[in-house]
């Protein structure tokens, strides 16, 4: 359920972020190219990277643009992956997650004519970088609400892969939804 909600949110955000691009696509002689750089885990991680890629694939089909991805096995791959897409003249390069912020900033500063976007980071203040931020607590509220309604034990929980601001927001939303649905519930974290 969470994966489907995240895929829908990412798809909508990516489509919205590139919705102003049809004019650019129509004016270009070459096909508009969008590249996605994953965090570690790759496009088959069953989580954030995969949802981002699936959303971008859908956006590519709907907008008629070329999409591709490069997987990062380690953080040492971030910068070389950026350089690959820049060297191949990609029009928009999307970084999946705040862990790619430094590499995105460096690539954007060195390539001011290339457009970049980064998911879940708003620390880069450059004219060629767009931050794609989501309200994780809103989607997780719905998941928590459903969990609160369907539990048979009044005892539920959730696990996050790491502790950061986005995961904390997810947890707050999940707990709020569960408690609103079932005031007698206990939420394990």
Language-model features and meaning:
Residues 1-32:
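Short, low-complexity disordered leader/linker segments with a strong preference
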Residues 27-189:
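A residue-level marker of the well-folded mature domains of exported/periplasmic proteins
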């Amino acid at each position: 359920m969470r994966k489907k909600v995240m895929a829908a949110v990412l798809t909508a955000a990516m489509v919205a972020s590139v919705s102003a691009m049809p004019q650019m696509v129509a004016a270009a002689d070459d096909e508009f190219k969008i590249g996605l750089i994953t965090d570690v885990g790759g496009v088959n991680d069953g989580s954030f990277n995969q949802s981002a890629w699936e959303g971008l694939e859908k956006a590519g089909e709907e907008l008629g643009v070329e999409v591709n991805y490069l997987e990062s096995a380690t953080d040492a791959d971030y910068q070389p992956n950026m350089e690959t897409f820049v060297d191949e003249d990609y029009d928009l390069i999307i970084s999946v997650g705040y862990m790619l912020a430094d590499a995105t900033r460096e690539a954007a500063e060195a390539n001011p004519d290339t457009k970049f976007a980064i998911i879940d980071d708003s620390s880069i203040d450059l004219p060629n970088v767009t931050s794609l931020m989501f309200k994780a607590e809103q989607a997780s509220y719905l998941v928590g609400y459903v969990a609160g309604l369907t539990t048979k034990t009044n005892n539920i929980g959730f696990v996050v892969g790491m502790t950061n601001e986005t995961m904390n927001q997810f947890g707050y939303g999940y707990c709020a939804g569960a408690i609103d649905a079932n005031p007698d519930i206990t939420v394990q974290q």
